[in-house]
Amino acid sequence: MKFAVIVFPGSNCDVDMYHAIADELGEEVEYVWHDEENLDRFDAILLPGGFSYGDYLRSGAIARFSKVMAAVKQAAEAGKPVLGVCNGFQILLEAGLLPGAMRRNQGLKFICRPVQLVVENNETMFTSAYGKDEVITIPIAHGEGNYYCDEQTLNRLVENRQIVFRYHGENPNGSLADIAGIVNERGNVLGMMPHPERAVDALLGSADGLKLFRSIVNYWRETHVVTA
């Protein structure tokens, strides 16, 4: 399986994402610059965190116009796994690949610490390695993680089981309905504010994020039969 880690000007979590895939999973991964126009050679697309284009205008607002985003949309339409973490989630929202918007944290401060999440839906290609309602520890690092959508969209997210992760015990940023991560209706595009790539080794404080990446690999292996 081959992963693409999309690199925008200002990305700063691309190396962590690469490490999680290459060193922890042992899968093939490649950095892809933001002006790439073809992602056909990749099986999964990863949009890392950071401050793309300096977060000018608002987080993800400029990155959505990068050349690579047309290819990301094509990958999503083809059913490939697309994961956006933190700034990557914000970019997916701005690009219309996920519903809703991101606002400043309720306390108007940048938050950087581990939080607990509950796995709301473990029947997705990103969460199959988790147990239903499993509580996991994943770090956050953001100033604009306050997810918001209108009531109709929220009802649809709930009905379709598109809310994959919720904050558990404490909502650190004021996010609507404690939402920490959502998928699209098809279930192949996940956006989440917490950083699973920073929780892939117990030495880092938690290895709970590794199951997310393993879930992607397991899904791909189950749906791609390799014949000799």
From Swiss-Prot:
Molecular function GO terms recorded: ATP binding; glutaminase activity; phosphoribosylformylglycinamidine synthase activity
Pathway stated in the Swiss-Prot or TrEMBL entry: Purine metabolism; IMP biosynthesis via de novo pathway; 5-amino-1-(5-phospho-D-ribosyl)imidazole from N(2)-formyl-N(1)-(5-phospho-D-ribosyl)glycinamide: step 1/2
Function: Part of the phosphoribosylformylglycinamidine synthase complex involved in the purines biosynthetic pathway. Catalyzes the ATP-dependent conversion of formylglycinamide ribonucleotide (FGAR) and glutamine to yield formylglycinamidine ribonucleotide (FGAM) and glutamate. The FGAM synthase complex is composed of three subunits. PurQ produces an ammonia molecule by converting glutamine to glutamate. PurL transfers the ammonia molecule to FGAR to form FGAM in an ATP-dependent manner.
Quaternary structure (record): Part of the FGAM synthase complex composed of 1 PurL, 1 PurQ and 2 PurS subunits.
GO CC terms of this entry: cytoplasm
One Pfam family linked to the record: GATase_5
Active site (UniProt): C86, H195, E197
Keywords recorded for this protein, A-Z: ATP-binding, Cytoplasm, Glutamine amidotransferase, Hydrolase, Ligase, Nucleotide-binding, Purine biosynthesis
Residues covered by the Glutamine amidotransferase type-1 domain: 3-226
Protein name: Phosphoribosylformylglycinamidine synthase subunit PurQ
UniProt GO BP: 'de novo' IMP biosynthetic process
Localization annotation: Cytoplasm
Source species: Geobacillus thermodenitrificans (strain NG80-2)
Primary site of residence: cytoplasm
UniProt keyword ATP-binding present: yes
InterPro entries named in the record: Class_I_gatase-like, PRibForGlyAmidine_synth_PurQ
Enzyme Commission number, as recorded: 6.3.5.3, 3.5.1.2
Reactions catalysed according to its record: N(2)-formyl-N(1)-(5-phospho-beta-D-ribosyl)glycinamide + L-glutamine + ATP + H2O = 2-formamido-N(1)-(5-O-phospho-beta-D-ribosyl)acetamidine + L-glutamate + ADP + phosphate + H(+); L-glutamine + H2O = L-glutamate + NH4(+)
